């Protein structure tokens, strides 16, 4: 059977027959025809949506642990022991649902002391 004959055979099928063909191909080859469609459809929706709230996560303390603890105390309002525990337990989320400006400010302060921060 040539490629053209195969295409002509598909053209002559009903929607139900095409559906059965797709299911048979999925089973035979262990693939899913829907996976590509889902990924393609999800991409533009995410691009159009801009986040307004961020979680600020301390991912790495760096060399200036004492200075990072001071900044963590400042931005979270925690006591010395609690702030030290957070820093020692990195990666940890320091602030949840922070505005973009607040998250950027916290990130800048921590990075100035040598810490690594991720906004999620």
From Swiss-Prot:
The gene is rplL. This is Large ribosomal subunit protein bL12. Keywords: Ribonucleoprotein, Ribosomal protein. The lineage of its organism: Bacteria, Bacillati, Bacillota, Clostridia, Lachnospirales. Forms part of the ribosomal stalk which helps the ribosome interact with GTP-bound translation factors. Is thus essential for accurate translation. It comes from Lachnoclostridium phytofermentans (strain ATCC 700394 / DSM 18823 / ISDg) (Clostridium phytofermentans). Pfam families: Ribosomal_L12, Ribosomal_L12_N. GO terms for molecular function: mRNA binding; structural constituent of ribosome. Disulfide bonds: none annotated. GO terms for biological process: translation.
């Amino acid at each position: 059977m040539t490629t053209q004959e195969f295409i002509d055979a598909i053209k002559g099928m009903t929607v139900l027959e095409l559906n059965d063909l797709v299911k048979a191909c999925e089973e035979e080859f262990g693939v899913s025809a829907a996976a590509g469609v889902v990924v393609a459809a999800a991409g533009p929706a995410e691009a159009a949506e801009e986040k307004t709230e961020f979680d600020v996560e301390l991912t790495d303390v760096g060399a200036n642990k004492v200075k990072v603890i001071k900044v963590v105390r400042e931005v979270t309002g925690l006591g010395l022991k609690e702030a030290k525990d957070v820093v020692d337990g990195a990666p940890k989320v320091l602030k949840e649902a922070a505005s973009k400006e607040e998250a950027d400010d916290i990130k800048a302060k921590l990075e100035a002391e040598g810490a690594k921060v991720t906004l999620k």
